[in-house]
Design a protein with these regions (language model features):
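Acidic/His-rich, divalent-metal-binding segments that scaffold phosphate/diphosphate chemistry
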Residues: 1-37, 43-46
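Histidine-centered, transition-metal-coordinating active-site segments
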Residues: 1-4, 36-157
């Protein structure tokens, strides 16, 4: 695992986000005839806008990881797959935490179908997700989750 590559992908993967996050992205997607995707905008920023229009001298592995970091994407490298999972783990847990803090939901409102697998607190969920990925990926040519954890993870979205 190349930590520098993982870090470069992680640092660049969300550069193209719009104001108001995914809601802003959906609004721009309706306006532009060719659509709008923040991951494509992130690549555009690092390839064309940085350094006065010269772009950054990034490897294809970094650009591929930035472009394919969404859960539906398929990064070509293990490092890109690590960032893809890390991004979604953070995103889902932040959304749950924000919803609880805002009083929209309570921790006990989360479906038992998912929390019985992942855990009933943010700390438990993070621990389960990270350990599952490490255990399922150790000595294998891919980064992956077990079926039951992946089911619960996708359900929490």
């Amino acid at each position: 695992m190349n930590e520098d590559l993982t870090e470069a992908i992680a640092l660049g993967h969300d550069l193209g986000h719009t104001p108001f996050g995914h809601a802003g992205e959906r609004a721009l997607n309706k306006i532009f005839s060719e659509g709008f995707a923040h991951q494509k905008q992130s690549v555009r920023i690092v390839e064309k806008l940085e350094k006065g229009g010269r772009g950054l001298n990034l490897t294809w592995e970094v650009r591929d990881g930035i472009l394919n970091h969404q859960l539906s994407g398929n990064p070509s490298t293990l490092e890109g797959k690590v960032v893809r999972y890390a991004d979604k783990i953070a995103y889902i847990n932040h959304d749950v935490d924000d919803s609880i803090r805002a009083g929209i939901i309570r921790e006990e409102d989360l479906p038992d179908t998912y929390t019985d697998i992942l855990g009933h607190s943010t700390r438990e969920r993070l621990n389960t997700l990270i350990h599952d990925i490490v255990n399922q990926s150790k000595d294998k040519p891919d980064i992956q989750m077990s079926e039951d954890v992946e089911f619960a993870f996708r359900g929490m979205r």
